[in-house]
Amino acid sequence: MLLALRARLGYWLARRLFHWRWPLQQPRAWAWMQGQYARMAALGHVPAQSFYGHILLFRGQGFGAREEGLRLLRLAAQGGDGKAAYQLGVQCLAGDARQQPDAAEAARWWTRAAEAGHPLAAQRLAQLYRQGAPGLPADPQQAEHFARQAESLGFRPKG
């Protein structure tokens, strides 16, 4: 109980410090902050898994950081986090050195994100189904469905 409270307080403080420039430039402060994010993520806190997963994916040092970031994003997406599911879809569609782009897997993650209320995921699904992709045939009905869902979630195209 006390350790969980300490973890929550440390995470809260680290999230507040994240918005200041100085702690991010200090190696010891940054290491402490990452420790707080990792601790809360390990305790199963979905927002911490999503936040730290994004940090590791985009700012992590080395190949292991990227893989850990994807693992945390996967856990967060399975816990219902729409941003994490959206980012996993983006990563699946982009592919990397070890795997080909996978449009069907991207569609699965974006469907989860859209169900969680992520408007851009619904819009990207509409585009994906409108154009089709390797392994995912074009489907105008699905495209229209997700375009309507994106609008209902608040997506407004530029222009």
Please place each PLM-identified region on the residue numbering.
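Canonical positions in the second alpha-helix
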Residues: 38-40, 74-76, 111-113, 150
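Hydrophobic face of amphipathic alpha-helices that form TPR/SEL1-like repeat modules
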Residues: 15-20, 51-58, 87-95, 124-131
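Alpha-helical segment of the N-proximal tetratricopeptide repeat
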Residues: 9-28, 32, 36-39, 43, ...
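Short helix-capping/linker turns of helical repeat alpha-solenoids
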Residues: 10, 43-46, 58-60, 79-82, ...
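TPR/TPR-like (Sel1-like) alpha-helical repeat modules
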Residues: 108-113, 123, 127-130, 137-155
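Structural signature of tandem alpha-helical TPR/SEL1-like repeats
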Residues: 25-35, 61-72, 98-109, 137-147
